[in-house]
Amino acid sequence: MAIGSKIIKPGGSDPDDFEKSIAQALVELEANSDLKPYLRDLHITRAREIEFGSKKAVIIYVPIPQQKVFQKIQIILVRELEKKFSGKHVVVIGERKILPKPTRKARNPLKQKRPRSRTLTAVYDAILEDLVFPAEIVGKRIRVKLDGSQLVKVHLDKNQQTTIEHKVDTFTSVYKKLTGRDVTFEFPDNYLNV
């Protein structure tokens, strides 16, 4: 199995060494594990490594049409990749595009209306959903400070606290790096005990 089939970059550009190492890890996982039927048709679009404090995180971008299949195997896949990359936290995010806001005096007006899924807000919300997967976002509070800066408090499902609590700092720093927005994650108690 060739590494080139596991990473297909938009625009046909060549992957760098780090992206090749991720693709190689995916090829090895496909050859040796029970993930083979899932990984056979899947590929990634790009990968990045970011540093925060003394730790590092790996961000893997996947095509949106394949994201649902990636999410089926994400828990096992992330665990195996974290073993291969010596404990670095691995995050899988969908490859999304933000279209600019149309202006009134645009030289070449858009031929069709900008879809909601391509707006900045929708893309940033989707990145947040992808980051915390498999946990579910159950609530969100946006606090606007007097200087105009925003602090987003994201409430996550209490049932998933044990599985992702150790990654909350990673999620915060990755989201800050990708979007420039501050976010804090909380696990509030369920008020509606039915």
UniProtKB/Swiss-Prot annotation:
GO terms for cellular component: 90S preribosome; cytosolic small ribosomal subunit; small-subunit processome. The keyword Repressor does not apply. The keyword Nucleus does not apply. Pfam families: Ribosomal_S7e. One of its GO terms (molecular function) is structural constituent of ribosome. Keywords: Ribonucleoprotein, Ribosomal protein. One of its GO terms (biological process) is ribosomal small subunit biogenesis. It comes from the Eukaryota. Belongs to the eukaryotic ribosomal protein eS7 family. This is Small ribosomal subunit protein eS7. It comes from Drosophila yakuba (Fruit fly). The gene is RpS7.
